[in-house]
């Protein structure tokens, strides 16, 4: 092929060569396979080696399971998700579902390679599925332009493996809770067939991590919640009266000016995916920054602060996605021992990787199957319990709803998410636990957006 050929001619020539290869090798009709297509996978599945699982027996059945049966769910179709989808599709996985609630922004195009400029504004899940179904013969990627909370346990139970490429701790905690809720126990013994393995990957700049979670058997997300850094929040006094950073100006407009001015109508919430909303925040932030001689407010920074965007580097995404896809392959085929169970990656200065076994917490609120013990004085106010649930490093709840059984009736002590109930139960926050009728050994049921399950707490008076 001459070096001077235009890219379009090169592309057509490559397509012609591929068509010729399929004709010579002998295509397999409507299957989309040709001789030698899966040779790179067969090397791992049809022969043994020094790293294969001791109980693994090479055969053709494992490849057929990948091609025909194994169903994988990918959560997230962003920078990490695009890499994951590509890796899985090219590794023989054909039954893939993908969930993503976001639409494509022009800033995504530099690293989320399944998208093109013409796709801006369209759902990521749908475009990613279209691209892979068109590019990879016989691959069936099913898109879901939804939140993960839109699906019930029946939906998640159909998958053999779930792999996450999320940028949200809340979403991770929710899917973790969902998979734990799928577990079945017989006389206290876990039924292995009810386990849906979770492979979780995350990146931030030049750092990343990947982990293998076998719900009910290994450490879950809640067991290691302290490993996730808390969200950065700026003091309100600094934002309002002494801004020093461009982020302070953006947060001021987001938290104070937007609710006050309601620029798009009464009750219209700020939507980080709406360009008009971001533009309004950006303009107002520039105005406030000029009042304090602060430089550096840009549209991209505004979008990042409003949406809590995590810095992304394409090469880090590629490394972590490769690790996650490898773990999916190992678990699906049982050909190799999976990661046990946490890997960290860092290439800020040189290249560093490390693996260790994250341990289960005996009193994990998600996977221990035991009520959590909490200690308070009878004179403590319900507000103190609420503060504990939200501020505790091991719980980090967002908007806990507290209920208890009193005199044989289920009573809501506080519920924040419904305005009418919040107003009715707000006076309870200033009451003591004794005044509310709670007793030593009382069980409190707490619901929160971080988990689909209700978490039980046992109250002990001190």
Swiss-Prot record:
Residues 368-462 are annotated as: Interaction with UBE2M core domain. Residues 242-248, 292-295 are annotated as: Interaction with NAE1. Residues 227-229, 352-357 are annotated as: Interaction with NEDD8. The record marks 211 as: Determines specificity for NEDD8. The modification N-acetylalanine is found at residue 2. Pfam families: E2_bind, ThiF. Pathway: Protein modification; protein neddylation. Gene3D superfamilies: NAD(P)-binding Rossmann-like Domain, Ubiquitin activating enzymes (Uba3). Chain: B, domain 2, Ubiquitin-like 2 activating enzyme e1b. Chain: B, domain 3. It catalyses: ATP + [NEDD8 protein] + [E1 NEDD8-activating enzyme]-L-cysteine = AMP + diphosphate + [E1 NEDD8-activating enzyme]-S-[NEDD8 protein]-yl-L-cysteine. One of its GO terms (molecular function) is identical protein binding. GO terms for biological process: endomitotic cell cycle; mitotic cell cycle; negative regulation of DNA-templated transcription; protein neddylation; regulation of cell cycle. The active site is at 237 (glycyl thioester intermediate). Transmembrane segments: none annotated. Keywords: Acetylation, ATP-binding, Cell cycle, Ligase, Nucleotide-binding, Ubl conjugation pathway. Binding of TP53BP2 to the regulatory subunit NAE1 decreases activity. ATP binds at residues 100-124, 148-171. Its EC number is 6.2.1.64. Residues 53-70, 157-161, 192-217, 331-338 are annotated as: Interaction with UBE2M N-terminus. The keyword Nucleotide-binding applies. Ubiquitously expressed. GO terms for cellular component: cytoplasm; nucleus; protein-containing complex. Arg-211 acts as a selectivity gate, preventing misactivation of ubiquitin by this NEDD8-specific E1 complex. Heterodimer of UBA3 and NAE1. Interacts with NEDD8, UBE2F and UBE2M. Binds ESR1 and ESR2 with bound steroid ligand. Interacts with TBATA. Catalytic subunit of the dimeric UBA3-NAE1 E1 enzyme. E1 activates NEDD8 by first adenylating its C-terminal glycine residue with ATP, thereafter linking this residue to the side chain of the catalytic cysteine, yielding a NEDD8-UBA3 thioester and free AMP. E1 finally transfers NEDD8 to the catalytic cysteine of UBE2M. Down-regulates steroid receptor activity. Necessary for cell cycle progression. This is NEDD8-activating enzyme E1 catalytic subunit. The gene is Uba3.
């Amino acid at each position: 092929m001459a070096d001077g050929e235009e890219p379009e001619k090169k592309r057509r020539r490559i397509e012609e060569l591929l068509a010729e290869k399929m004709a010579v090798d002998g295509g397999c009709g409507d299957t989309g396979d040709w001789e030698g297509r899966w040779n790179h996978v067969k090397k791992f599945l049809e022969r043994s080696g020094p790293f294969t699982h001791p109980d693994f027996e090479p055969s053709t059945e494992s490849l057929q399971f990948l091609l025909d049966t194994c169903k994988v769910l990918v959560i997230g179709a962003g920078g990490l998700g695009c890499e994951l989808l590509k890796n899985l599709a090219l590794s023989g996985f054909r039954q893939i579902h993908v969930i993503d609630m976001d639409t494509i922004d022009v800033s995504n195009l530099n690293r989320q390679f399944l998208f093109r400029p013409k796709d801006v504004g369209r759902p990521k899940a749908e475009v990613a599925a279209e691209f892979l179904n068109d590019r990879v013969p016989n691959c069936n990627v099913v898109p879901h332009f939804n939140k993960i909370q839109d699906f019930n346990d029946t939906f998640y139970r159909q998958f053999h493996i779930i792999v996450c490429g999320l940028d949200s701790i809340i979403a991770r905690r929710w899917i973790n809770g969902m998979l734990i809720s799928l577990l079945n126990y017989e006389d206290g013994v876990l039924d292995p067939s009810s386990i849906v393995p979770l492979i979780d990957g995350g990146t931030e700049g030049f750092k990343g991590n990947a982990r293998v979670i076998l719900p009910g058997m290994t450490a879950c997300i809640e067991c290691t919640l302290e490993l996730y850094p808390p969200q950065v929040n700026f003091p309100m006094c600094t934002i309002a009266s002494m801004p020093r950073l461009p982020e302070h100006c953006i947060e001021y407009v987001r938290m104070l000016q937007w609710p006050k001015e309601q620029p798009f109508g009464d009750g219209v919430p700020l939507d980080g995916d709406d360009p008009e909303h971001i533009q309004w925040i950006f303009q107002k932030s520039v105005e406030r920054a000029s009042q304090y001689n602060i430089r550096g407010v840009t549209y991209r920074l505004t979008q990042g602060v409003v949406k809590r965007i995590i810095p992304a580097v394409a090469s880090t995404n590629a490394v972590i996605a490769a690790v996650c896809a490898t773990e999916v392959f190992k678990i699906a085929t049982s050909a190799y021992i999976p990661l046990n169970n946490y890997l960290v990656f860092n290439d800020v200065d040189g290249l560093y990787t490390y693996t260790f076994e994250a341990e289960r917490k005996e009193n994990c609120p998600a996977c221990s199957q035991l009520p959590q013990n909490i200690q308070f004085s009878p004179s403590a106010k319900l507000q103190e319990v609420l503060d504990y649930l939200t501020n505790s490093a091991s719980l980090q709840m967002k908007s806990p709803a507290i209920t208890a059984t009193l005199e044989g009736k289920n009573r809501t002590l506080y519920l924040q998410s419904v305005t009418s109930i919040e107003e009715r139960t707000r006076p309870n926050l200033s009451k003591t636990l004794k005044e509310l009728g709670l007793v030593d050994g009382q069980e409190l049921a707490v619901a929160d957006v971080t988990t689909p399950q209700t978490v039980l707490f046992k109250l002990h008076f001190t």
